[in-house]
């Protein structure tokens, strides 16, 4: 991933789970590689990942996540966890779009590494970002102001205090039981 040349990558209708957070980052494109676009649609990421997206390409790239569910990710408490999204080697000409996604259990409460489970660690996001109609629940460090580049900058968020009441999250069934949350139609559509 340090010298790869990628054009357009699409991940659609996938479930990716149980990737040990101690083993590394989720989508990992290091400096020296090239990417035109990464589009992730209607997919679920569950249990694992240190930094979820580590995109350090230096060229202009477009990255988007649409209707995805993130469950129990970025929970490793060490200095290698830079939160959910990292695009720190590019410029403001690059784009990161996160739309209609559901986030549950991102990070941990009171971590030693204050960047664990944040949206983007300070200084680790240079792309222009767009966050639209996302839903967050039980993400205690997501908008931590001490080491996050963003502090609750989500102005278009549904009721983040309503428990989604997953049917059986421990077994991988993230079907939403709470009708109020289900009606929001955010996250991977297979679950609502």
What are these regions (language model features)?
Residues 1-173, 188-190:
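Extracellular beta-rich repeat passengers
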